[in-house]
Curated annotation (Swiss-Prot):
SUPFAM superfamilies: beta and beta-prime subunits of DNA dependent RNA-polymerase (SSF64484). The gene is rpoC2. Binds 1 Zn(2+) ion per subunit. One of its GO terms (molecular function) is DNA-directed RNA polymerase activity. Keywords: DNA-directed RNA polymerase, Metal-binding, Nucleotidyltransferase, Transcription, Transferase, Zinc. This is DNA-directed RNA polymerase subunit beta'. In cyanobacteria the RNAP catalytic core is composed of 2 alpha, 1 beta, 1 beta', 1 gamma and 1 omega subunit. When a sigma factor is associated with the core the holoenzyme is formed, which can initiate transcription.
Length: 1367
């Protein structure tokens, strides 16, 4: 039986129409004839499974693949059930090699630390080396884990899961059985203590805590990522939702070039259509234009060594507002050419948005691990190194502190073998590091060089690290450092190292001297332990009587009474009540003052000491305060302490009882506005204290307050009188007539009031308080002295309330307070006054109040010596109650020497105090005996391994102090390497304690901080954000010239352009120049490091091309360059996270971002300057205008971020449903926009069928029907429905003036055939061009026209497939 394909059998059975046969043939399994069966014997992991399923799908279609996948699933389940793969603790096998690897790492790190100790590398280099060592160890351990499982236990559950790709990956297995590795702290810096253990061995507490940083970061990031990713997807969908495949072929000749990377294309060509024939080296055609590239063809192209392929892409598709099938290529869902009506925009948006959650927010700063980009070359044989005549190298220091040479040009490095045989050649590229010298003899397997990967200049940033001193001693510079004083713009002077060199600290015992201590011993003197090195004295500033206090803490207090004042005419009485003790001052006439500042407390200037206890100014209830004329108060900043009286007078008081209630209204027991007697119960359990008229305030059935106003009430009907006393009320003097028959005898306050009986006036009693001008004061109010501070008291009267203030209260209040206030003169601000109790000198039973001003001197007690201070001994020079003068010494402190040695004082300027001194002890020096004559000199500094005599190495670091015959005395020291440009915190000869900062190393590291990783970076690219502090870009191509600026640090870069114009680029401080003098640069190339501003880049590209090409070409080429860059950048982020996205998805989005131009000059078109418009629309407009001979529109291309592009779409319904709804709709209404409902969103919102998928062809029919006889709306054109706007000189568009008129007026005048003919002739339009269609009338029917009759072969093919009936 000849095998037929399933498809042909199906169609033939259909053609014969025999149902029986059809039913029978269903049961026969179609033989798989397309490919011969193949037998593969290998382990199938996740990747192979993918390939297997893809192969089945490609060769045998969906049904077979589904059946096979089902069978695979059953197979998997069956064996998984039998195998019972599970994880147990025993499955976690730690490789035995781990201890060796850790041991090796420890050795390397010990060696690094030793180099650091000897001052051979800087702190930064040490840190970098440690991090790199651990990173490398970790990698090697992963390999060991893989090897261990593969060799010893290939069926281990953990290994099978990770290896097959079923669950988990190697980085997780590494943490289970390898080591957890390096962790970062919250600032993103790597902690150089790695976690050496794994989860199988268990973590120590420290390691557990270090791990917790990362754990929290992971949780927080995940929570933030989901939200961010969702919003990104929404914006992408919005920008691309109207991209639908609407055409078969746009016919463009433009294309994009895809270059091979290392001779491979990978998957980048699969599913694309060829734009230009691909030919191999012999000019044989491999693939013709419009061939779809499948994986086989892709491999074939690679084999033919084709470097670049021109393919069709959505970026260059010329279909209007859509993409054509051929430019899009395969739909990746079924690996066939995409169907018409496919909503490729939404697919693109989802493909980019969906992996968003997998992207990390930020990655750690790695410690400059740059092993990936550079290849290390080792020698294959022993021999002699030769650089050759072309070589140019310069000295270079690697980040690990290894001295090497860097190649300035490309050259060949030869190794001439020592024995006969073939030598070795190494290609050295410019920028590579060479670790051997010219002419050096090397063994086999020696590292020769590190080859730089291309001339990529990494962007770097400056970072700093402190160098901390490990021992106390004296600083000495090496001459190599060449310190230089640098003044910055603020005038601060810093000391900087100009060259690489060592900074030494020579050991010694450094003493910190207290302030005002002076050395009492000469430099270079020998001292014994216990000898006085320095003395400090403390003296009294004002003098007075000495009081010695008990010691407090580690110091004793000496108090000196400088001023005192006793109040002799007042007795001090102590009373106690429930709230504690109360102190009162009582004068002979019985007036009493209550003391605020109790004895033992301290008070300052202008503070209140006591208040007069006076009941004369106390009221019975609350009320209203009025000042009578004459009474005046001082203005005060705050009314907290009341108002000070400046002029005495009368204070008037109108009593009024106020109860604040806040209870339910049902508890009220009286009526509003009725007269009540004293003692009436107004609310349950609340009684009135006075008689009068009640006012009740309530809100929402809650009683707020009840006011009782006492006085005489008179009914009154005279409206003038009622008006006169309305609102606030008035004071009426005695004898003045208020109304007929109402004449008060005393002063009253008259107010209009409404009661239950009716309106009238209430005469309220007024109490008058007389306030004197001056307050009375105890005798002896001042103590003055010639020198030092003076004391005084003054009395003030303060009113508690201002004029017209209402006091709501039931209890009484105090209207006036008389206060005693302290005044001090000539005092320092920190001086306080102490309040004390003394006995009267004549009668011991009476106590008096005494105010004293004390000078307090803290005297240090003797201290036993510690690491930074010598022991001190303090002696008091005064006795208790001794009188001292100002400037007398109260105590002296001596600093004693701890151990015997030689004293050295630092070199100081004359007026500078000495704050530290150093004693060089016996233990700070060592004496070495040389076997033969020493080769060292006095003053020379040596490190471990330097020679003492011809044979003997020295085993310590330090400075040679003396040489006597064969004995060499060495003062121990510690070298610290500092790199050029480091900031030095200490000067030569300075004394430092352990833990002091010596220098700040300034180093360059690869910029990682602002290369935002993952989602934020994707967002930055797609939103086309302008980065902060971006790189300076070259505007036009030319040759670079670099000059120094006015000051040392600044640089001026000049670019000499092709027409000899010179463009200057001033470069700011802190920017690194990325180009070299004499280099040729292109437009858009980076002159300095930093992130690139995409808008500026587009400007540079366009500006440069504009000079050489027509406007349209320049714009298209500039956009193409930018598009390529954007696609690459977005892909890089996803690739770095291991996410694979097809280029075409990103291209669809980027196309939407770059499809608009801004009109600069409208020419003779109807466009507006500043308008954003599709580039293809401008192209059409300019073409049409050029037919009429008018001036075309000038424009510049723009890049829009996805949000901006969404808001700038033609459809206002889509834009309004996205963001800024009100603004979009208002603008659309003002402009009278129409929405042509082209996209999906608009149609969904309105509730129509969406124009994609099955709705697509319906959409086409409907448009045709709508178009009718108006060629203006839709031009009949195979390239979709193109709206030609505002271009016909002989068409008028009348807008309806009102909705009613809209139904009557025809919107477009329909031209006659004659008109169209005339127009065509006028413009000389050839009927064969596409422009002809714009001026032709579309045919109304959809039948085949004569010249379009179908190809008979095509009809037969359709019949063959059963898609066309025999009729």
């Amino acid at each position: 039986m000849t095998s037929t394909s399933p498809k042909s059998r199906k169609s033939s059975s259909k053609r014969k129409g025999s149902k029986k046969k059809a039913a029978r043939s269903k049961n026969v399994i179609p033989p798989l004839s397309k490919t011969p069966p193949s037998f593969r014997n290998c382990v199938v992991d996740k990747k192979s499974l993918k390939q297997l399923v893809a192969w089945a799908f490609k060769n045998h279609g969906t049904a077979v693949t589904a059946a096979m996948a089902d069978n695979l699933k059953d197979l998997g389940f069956k064996y998984a059930t039998q195998a019972a793969v599970s994880i147990s603790v025993d499955d976690l096998k730690v490789p035995e090699a781990k201890q060796d690897l850790l041991g090796q790492a420890e050795e390397q790190i010990t060696a690094t630390e030793e180099c650091y100790r000897l001052g051979e590398i800087t702190e930064v280099e040490r840190h970098t080396k440690v991090i790199d060592t651990w990173t490398e160890t970790n990698e090697r351990l992963v390999d060991a884990v893989k090897k261990n499982f593969n060799h010893n236990d290939p069926l281990n559950s953990v290994w099978m899961m990770a290896n097959s790709g079923a669950r988990g990956n190697m980085s997780q297995v590494r943490q289970l059985v390898g080591m957890r590795g390096l962790m970062a702290n919250p600032q993103g810096e790597i902690i150089d203590l790695p976690i050496r253990t794994n989860f199988r061995e268990g973590l120590t507490v420290t390691e557990y805590v270090i791990s917790s940083y990362g754990a929290r970061k992971g949780l927080v990031d995940t929570a933030l990522r989901t939200a961010d990713s969702g919003y990104l997807t929404r914006r992408l969908v919005d920008v691309a939702q109207d991209v639908i495949v609407r055409e078969e072929d746009c016919g463009t000749t433009r294309a994009i070039l895809i270059n091979a990377e290392d001779g491979r294309f990978g998957n980048r060509l699969v599913g694309r259509l060829v734009a230009e024939d691909i030919v191999d080296q012999e000019d044989a055609v491999i693939a013709k234009r419009d061939t779809a590239i499948d994986p086989e063809l892709s491999k074939k192209i690679e084999k033919a060594n084709v470097n670049g392929v021109m393919i069709r892409s959505p970026l260059t598709c010329e279909a209007t507002r859509s993409v054509c099938r051929k430019c899009y290529g395969w739909a990746l869902a079924h690996n066939q050419l995409v169907d018409l009506g496919e909503a490729v925009g939404i697919i693109a948006a989802q493909s980019i948005g969906e992996p968003g959650t997998q992207l990390t927010m930020r990655t750690f700063h790695t410690g400059g691990v740059s092993t990936a980009e550079t290849g290390v070359v080792r020698s294959n044989l022993a021999g002699k190194v030769e650089f050759g005549p072309k070589a140019r190298v310069r000295g270079y220091r690697t980040p690990h502190g290894v001295e090497a040479q860097q190649a300035e040009v490309d050259f060949l490095l030869h190794i001439k073998p020592t024995e006969k045989g073939k030598g070795q050649k190494v290609e050295i590229s410019s920028g590579s590091l060479i670790f051997v010298e010219d002419g050096q003899e090397v063994d086999a397997d020696v590292t020769l060089a590190q080859i730089a990967a291309g001339a990529i200049k990494k962007s770097v940033e400056k970072a700093t690290k402190d160098v901390i001193c490990d021992l106390a001693g004296q600083v000495r510079y090496e001459e190599a450092i060449q310190p230089k004083e640098v003044t910055d713009r603020q005038g601060n002077i810093t000391l900087k190292a100009q060259r690489l060199g060592r900074l030494w600290v020579l050991a010694g015992d450094v003493y910190n001297l207290p302030p005002n201590a002076k050395p009492v011993i000469a430099s270079n003197a020998n001292v014994q332990a216990g000898k006085v090195l320095a003395e400090a004295s403390q003296s009294s500033e004002f003098g007075g009587e000495v009081r010695l206090r008990d010691s407090i803490g580690d110091s004793r207090e000496v108090q000196i009474v400088t001023t005192s004042m006793t109040l002799k005419d007042y007795n001090l009485l102590e009373e106690s009540n429930h709230s504690g003790e109360i102190w009162n001052l009582e004068a002979n006439d019985g007036t009493r003052y209550r003391i605020n500042s109790i004895p033992g407390s301290k008070i300052g200037n202008n503070e209140v000491i006591a208040e007069l206890s006076d009941d004369r100014f106390r009221t019975k209830t609350g009320g209203l305060v009025k000042y009578a004329p004459g009474l005046a108060i001082k203005k005060a900043r705050s009314a907290k302490n009341g108002f000070e009286v400046s002029n005495g007078g009368s204070l008037l008081w109108i009593p009024q009882e106020t109860h604040e209630i806040n209870k339910d209204i049902s508890l009220l027991m009286i009526q509003d506005r009725q007269w009540i007697e004293a003692g009436t119960e107004v609310v349950k359990d609340i009684f009135s204290q006075t008689a009068g008229i009640v006012t009740v305030t309530q809100k929402n059935d809650i009683l707020r307050e009840i006011i009782v106003r006492s006085g005489e009430f008179h009914l009154c009907t005279d409206s003038n009188i009622l008006e006169r006393f309305d609102n606030e009320g008035q004071i009426v003097n005695p004898g003045e007539t208020i109304a007929k028959g109402i004449k008060p005898e005393a002063m009253v306050f008259v107010q209009t009031i409404e009661t239950t009986e009716g309106k009238g006036v209430l005469l309220r009693p007024v109490e008058e308080y007389t306030i004197p001008d001056k307050a009375q004061l105890p005798e002896l109010s001042h103590v003055t002295q010639q020198q030092g501070p003076s004391l005084g008291l003054k009395a003030t009267q303060r009113l508690g309330y201002k004029d017209g203030e209402l006091i709501k209260s039931v209890e009484g209040v105090e209207l006036l307070k008389t206060q005693l206030i302290l005044e001090t003169f000539d005092t320092t601000p920190q001086m306080t006054v102490d309040v004390e109790v003394t006995e009267d000198q004549s009668t011991k039973t009476i106590q008096r109040l005494r105010l004293v001003i004390l000078e307090s001197i803290l005297v240090r007690r003797d201290t036993i010596s510690d690491s930074s201070h010598g022991s001190t001994h303090t002696e008091l020079q005064v006795k208790d109650q001794q009188i001292v003068k100002a400037g007398d010494i109260v105590a002296t402190t001596q600093i004693l020497c701890k151990e015997k040695g030689i004293v050295q004082l630092p070199e100081m300027k004359e007026d500078e105090p000495i704050r530290r001194l150093i004693v060089e002890r016996q233990e700070d020096t060592v004496t070495l005996t040389a076997a033969s004559k020493p080769v060292v000199k006095i003053g020379q500094r040596v490190i471990d391994g330097d020679l003492l005599s011809n044979e003997e190495p020295i085993n310590c670091c330090g400075e040679i102090e003396a040489i006597k015959e064969n004995k060499v005395t060495l003062r121990l020291g510690r070298p610290y390497m500092v790199s050029p440009d480091s900031v030095l915190h200490v000067k030569n000869g300075d004394l430092v304690q352990r833990g002091d900062g010596l220098a700040l190393l300034v180093f360059e590291r690869q910029k990682t901080g602002d290369i935002v990783q993952g989602l934020p970076r994707i967002e930055e690219l797609l939103e086309a954000r302008r980065p902060r502090d971006s790189a300076i870009l070259c505007k036009r191509r030319g040759i670079v010239e670099i000059n120094q600026g006015d000051d040392d640090d600044s640089v001026v870069v000049k670019v000499i352009e092709s027409d000899d114009l010179i463009e200057e680029y001033p470069i700011l401080l802190g920017k690194n120049v990325m180009i070299s003098d004499g280099q040729e640069v292109k437009a858009g190339e980076l002159l300095t490091d930093g992130p690139v501003n995409p808008h500026e880049l587009l400007e540079c590209f366009f500006g440069d091309l504009r000079d050489r090409k027509p406007l349209m070409e320049a714009a298209q080429e500039a956009i193409a360059k930018l598009q390529h860059r954007l696609v690459t950048e977005v892909q890089n982020v996803y690739k770095s996270q291991g996410v694979a996205i097809d280029d075409k998805h990103i291209e669809v989005i980027v196309r939407q971002m770059t499809s608009k131009v801004r009109i600069e000059d409208a020419g003779d078109t109807t466009l507006l300057p500043g308008e954003l418009i599709e580039i293809r629309q401008v192209e059409d407009t300019n073409q049409a205008i050029s037919i009429t001979g008018g001036a075309p529109a000038e424009f510049t291309p723009v890049l829009l971020g996805i949000t901006k592009a969404s808001l700038n779409t033609d459809s206002f319904i889509s834009a309004a449903s996205f963001q800024e709804t009100t603004r979009v709709l208002t603008e659309a209404a003002i402009e009278g926009k129409s929405d042509w409902l082209r996209g999906l969103k608009e149609n969904v919102i309105i509730g129509r069928l969406i124009p994609a998928g099955t709705g697509f062809s319906g959409f086409v029919e409907e448009l045709r029907a709508e178009a009718g006889p108006h060629p203006d709306i839709l031009a009949e054109d195979p390239a979709g429905y193109r709206r030609i706007q505002n271009l016909r000189p002989d068409y008028t568009v009348e807008m309806p003036s009102s909705p009613a008129a809209a139904n009557l007026t025809s919107v477009l005048d329909d031209p006659s055939d004659a008109d169209l003919e005339a127009t065509r002739n006028r413009h000389g339009i050839d009927p064969s061009t596409s422009n002809f269609a714009a001026f032709a009338r579309p045919s109304g029917d959809d039948n085949f026209q004569e010249d379009q009759s179908p190809d008979p072969a095509a009809l037969e093919g359709l019949q063959e497939e059963g898609l066309l009936s025999d009729e």
